């Protein structure tokens, strides 16, 4: 299967007083060393075709000569400054033609030539050749890269005529190779000679190689201006399907203050990859972030605005340097990812044994074959270092997408056929069904994160309108009307089922249930309700347990962070 996210080639064309020129293309066009040998022998009409050996060549742009590409890719001036897209058979060309608006005052005064002439180049186009069936998001991303490179080249051309100098060098080398080919056996590709002598050609080659491998492009055009680009399709992908950038962007927009940022590499190596002129705020976020610290705490510790932390976190996630998780705490439930490698002698198993000498990866992963909360691994008599190592192992497995986290969702389920709900005293308590511990026992990890406590309370903007403390206390007429209004959106049989629950006789419980009713549609997990309503976990679990006859509990991934948990590095 071909990789439709990688470009077939990169091409640089120009148009000017000397006509349309193909300055550089990479990979180089494959020349047929013995064209006569293919036509000297007559072929039978029943002979098997040998074109399969050159399928990649035929699918690419190598069948187009330099002259043809220069003609079709060097557009008119009217098309400059906008997206260029051309499909020919199974090849799609994407670029951003750019006009060079030269003025006499912009010609370099340091030119030693006695007669300086105006530059002959009118426009240029950096084009990426793709397969015709490439995803539209890939096409848009490569157009964005072409536009960035064109903008930098246009700036350097105005500043020091960089593009004109490189073009003159390339054309001179092409003429030299063409003259050499006249005395040899056949034509030679000039790009072999251009590559080691032209900085711009090497930059385009580096961009192509990076797009085909890591997807991260870092260029310094003219050893001066930086072009940074990320092809998210190369960084974010699942085991068997392509994750479009739109899905990543939707998840990033859904980040909440109770989420956490998990770096995918150690702090030292990540800081070493940052450019010299990077934002100091980004450095502070990297140094302050922790897997047990939510974004709200991260903003406080880094002394940054929460919105700025969101933006920096989204930047790190988009570039594949971090993922979004829920902060580690005892109540978190994890299970083995369906995409995890469980081979005994896999490279990951070797890395795990090197990182944690007293443990082996298959045995640890076996403990997560079924959903399990971290509280089940706690041993009150064990030293604190053992608990710290447990957190480190979970973080290590989350970084490599070996584990996925499951959240608790609650759905209102009242059957129309039931005239009255049947209380089930022999049922397993709700707290046991969701993996919770005693409601009066605080569940905090030794890392000391407030988010890992059973009594986690966070301040939320929505809390002002929905917090129970703001409602009048007691069974007042106002409270009764508010409860009736909240229950008015339900059907008749749903209201009857709820009111027939014994706990509904308690006005406080009924009012709290009615206030949380819009969360009982299976779209908000337990931790989100805790944050939005500024409510403790124990309060919610007790309420769910009292109304368990009309509630159905499910556990699955949070759609916001599920896209990050499914990604493979």
From Swiss-Prot:
GO BP annotation list:
aorta morphogenesis; cardiac muscle tissue development; cellular response to amino acid starvation; negative regulation of TORC1 signaling; positive regulation of autophagy; roof of mouth development; ventricular septum development
Residues covered by region (Disordered): 27-60, 416-477
Q: Where is the composition biased (Polar residues)?
A: 34-52, 438-468
Q: Write out the function statement from the record.
A: As a component of the GATOR1 complex functions as an inhibitor of the amino acid-sensing branch of the mTORC1 pathway. In response to amino acid depletion, the GATOR1 complex has GTPase activating protein (GAP) activity and strongly increases GTP hydrolysis by RagA/RRAGA (or RagB/RRAGB) within heterodimeric Rag complexes, thereby turning them into their inactive GDP-bound form, releasing mTORC1 from lysosomal surface and inhibiting mTORC1 signaling.
State the name under which the record lists this protein: GATOR1 complex protein NPRL3
Disorder noted:
Inactivating mutations and truncating deletions in the genes encoding GATOR1 proteins are detected in glioblastoma and ovarian tumors and are associated with loss of heterozygosity events. Inactivation of GATOR1 proteins promotes constitutive localization of mTORC1 to the lysosomal membrane and blocks mTORC1 inactivation following amino acid withdrawal.
Principal localization reads: membrane
């Amino acid at each position: 299967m071909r990789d439709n996210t990688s470009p077939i080639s990169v091409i640089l064309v120009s148009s000017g007083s000397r006509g349309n020129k193909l300055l550089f293309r990479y990979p180089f066009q494959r020349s047929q060393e013995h064209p006569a040998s293919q036509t000297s022998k007559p072929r039978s009409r029943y002979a098997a075709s040998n074109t399969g050996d050159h399928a990649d060549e035929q699918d690419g742009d190598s069948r187009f000569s330099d002259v043809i590409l220069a003609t079709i890719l060097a557009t008119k001036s009217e098309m400059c400054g906008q997206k260029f897209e051309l499909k020919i058979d199974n090849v799609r060309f994407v670029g951003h033609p750019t006009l060079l608006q030269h003025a006499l005052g912009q010609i370099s005064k340091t030119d030693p030539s006695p007669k300086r002439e105006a530059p002959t180049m009118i426009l240029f186009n950096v084009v990426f050749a793709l397969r015709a069936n490439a995803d539209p998001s890939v096409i848009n991303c490569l157009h964005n890269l072409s536009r960035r490179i064109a903008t930098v080249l246009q700036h350097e051309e105005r500043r020091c005529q960089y593009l004109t100098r490189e073009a003159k060098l390339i054309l001179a080398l092409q003429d030299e190779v063409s003259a050499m080919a006249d005395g040899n056996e056949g034509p030679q590709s000039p790009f072999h000679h251009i590559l080691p002598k032209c900085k711009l050609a090497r930059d385009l080659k580096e961009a192509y190689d990076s797009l085909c491998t890591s997807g991260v492009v870092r260029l310094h055009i003219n050893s001066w201006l930086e072009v940074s680009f990320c092809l998210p399709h190369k960084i974010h992908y699942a085991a068997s399907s392509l994750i479009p950038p739109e899905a990543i962007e939707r998840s990033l927009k859904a980040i909440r203050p109770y989420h956490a940022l998990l770096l995918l590499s150690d702090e030292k190596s990540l800081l070493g990859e940052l450019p010299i002129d990077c934002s100091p705020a980004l450095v502070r976020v990297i140094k302050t972030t922790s897997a047990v610290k939510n974004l709200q705490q991260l903003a406080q510790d880094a002394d940054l605005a929460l919105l700025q932390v969101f933006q920096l976190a989204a930047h790190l996630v988009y570039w594949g340097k971090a993922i979004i998780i829920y902060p580690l705490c005892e109540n978190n439930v994890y299970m083995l990812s369906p995409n995890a490698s469980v081979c005994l002698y896999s490279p990951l198993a070797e890395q795990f044994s090197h990182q944690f000498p007293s443990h082996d990866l298959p045995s640890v992963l076996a403990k997560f074959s079924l959903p399990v909360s971290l509280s089940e691994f706690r041993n009150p008599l064990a030293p604190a270092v053992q608990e710290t190592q447990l957190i480190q192992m979970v973080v290590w497995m989350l970084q490599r997408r070996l584990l996925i986290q499951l959240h608790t969702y609650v759905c209102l389920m009242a059957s129309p056929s039931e005239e009255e709900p049947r209380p089930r005293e022999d049922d397993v308590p709700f707290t046991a069904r969701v993996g919770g511990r005693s409601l009066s026992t605080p569940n905090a990890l030794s890392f000391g994160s407030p988010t890992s406590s059973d009594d986690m309370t966070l301040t939320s903007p929505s809390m002002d309108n929905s917090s129970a403390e703001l409602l009048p206390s007691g069974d007042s007429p106002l409270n009764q009307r508010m409860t009736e209004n909240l229950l008015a959106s339900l059907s008749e049989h749903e209201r009857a089922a709820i009111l027939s629950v014994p706990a509904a006789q308690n006005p406080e419980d009924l009012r709290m249930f009615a206030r949380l009713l819009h969360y009982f549609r299976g779209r908000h997990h337990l931790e989100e309700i805790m944050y939005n309503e500024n409510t403790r976990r124990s309060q919610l679990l007790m309420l769910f347990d009292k109304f368990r006859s009309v509630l159905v509990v499910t556990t699955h991934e949070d759609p916001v962070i599920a896209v990050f948990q499914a990604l493979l590095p």
